[in-house]
């Protein structure tokens, strides 16, 4: 028999083990449940996590996890998967779940580029009932539906979102509010209907007025802003000014002692270099400031230009077109004439011209530095501009062309006058008009390839969607098609813009040196085309537009746009009537910004508009040289130029906003 104390000891050990086993047996066998989801809060986890929780959860929480999964899928850029989950949401939802469903509907529509549906979904929400997280998403979706178009609704969304943000996001909100304001014309900002209780919005508009009235003088601007802060001490921008405004106030202009002008003075491009140089000299000497009140001058008898043949826009030699007797449309764009001359460089500044066709670029840059130049304008040809990266120079450089891949250099800006540049501006303009599916109708060949790629890239950046392309042959093919009565069916193919691009050719004033990029295309698309951007000569356009009209009814007809390639001197009244409704872009100088100067320069170049455009480029080269520091240092800085409204991108690539005109009843009218 075991001793009593041993039995008691063993029993004392066994009983707790049995009790623990009984306790564990009563516990559930699966892992502990995750905390209940909060659909009104943040969605920080991955969509995979939320989808897994949805599969494992009970019916009570299943819809919450699914709503979070949809939001996470949208954050990850997976709109198709988000749409699939959205369509399987249960019909019976709580009030909070229905509210989140409605907000997700707006976000999903915006992600699918259906801005009308997104706006409709937002309008059904009670903003006051939303959580702070939901309010932030509500305003972000409102901002997205504006698609970059400045409006009072966009400003109100930024203002409402501002108290919800902190740190870098708060500063970014102030910067974007200011950007939207500065993108408005004075007429647009002056016409804003501000309610009596919108003190913050009124403060923003007053700050804009102070900036516009004093931006030529940093000292005056600083004083005006200080007065503004006194009047609006609690305004969010009174504590932290927008970054761009701070840069303007703190801007320190750099001095320019001498300019080196790099141009090809021999070879095919000589005629273009001559036009640029003449425009540059005219702007430097202040001649364009007096052109508006002086009589047109006779064409010069320069033997270097006499008897030359102008390359046409397709790269072949052609005679200059006949004179165009009709007056240019009166544009709303202000004349750019004296602005840079009065506020910029002195007309007595030394300028030395270097011939890039006679020696290597590296030698010229070294020589220019030794000659005391502090600013280089040029080179002009794209292959020479590409060499700048491998030939670094301490000099500030305003290149007159743009490489395919721009690398940010602290001392280089790029100013190009090319059909690709014009196509990028057209994509922005067409997108701003609310079009959803544009088609680029371009000629077969290298020029068409490059324009299609440039337009498609810009369109994708604006909308996140693909543009369509369609090609046509020469005038003989077009005539054969129109004689057959077949018309032109718009059947585009989506352009898949290649990220790896070969070096493109150079087009200067119509001279093309090809090195093409072949855009890739997928299956044909014919429906929902609401805009057609046509790259054609006047003769080609006179055939293409009637063929489009022949195949489409007036109700289903897409809006038609064209490039400056279609506009030249000598277009008669029959052509203008045939082009009814078509919109096209061109430089302000040819759109009537300065009619007297246009008449003078057109006469000087025998109505060859390609050379007039290069003359305007020379004018703007002087303007940009006068404001090189602002363009290089102040993001978004704008200058009214002869080739467009000039502004600098992040890499100091000069963007040109062109003037758009439209044919109406045989007349040219500005597109406002």
Curated annotation (Swiss-Prot):
Membrane topology: Lipid-anchor
Record key words, sorted: Cell outer membrane, Cell shape, Lipoprotein, Membrane, Palmitate, Peptidoglycan synthesis, Signal
Signal peptide: 1-26
GO MF term (any one): enzyme regulator activity
Lipid group attachment sites (S-diacylglycerol cysteine): 27
Stored Pfam families: LppC
One Gene Ontology cellular component annotation held by this UniProt entry: periplasmic side of cell outer membrane
Region (Disordered): 298-336
Keyword Acetylation in record: no
An annotated GO BP: regulation of cell shape
Keyword Transmembrane helix attributed: no
Biased composition (Polar residues): 305-322
Residues anchoring lipid (N-palmitoyl cysteine): 27
Quaternary structure (record): Interacts with PBP1a.
Function recorded in the entry: Regulator of peptidoglycan synthesis that is essential for the function of penicillin-binding protein 1A (PBP1a).
Family that this chain belongs to: Belongs to the LpoA family.
Cited HAMAP family: LpoA (MF_01890)
Protein name stated in the entry: Penicillin-binding protein activator LpoA
Originating species: Pectobacterium parmentieri (strain WPP163)
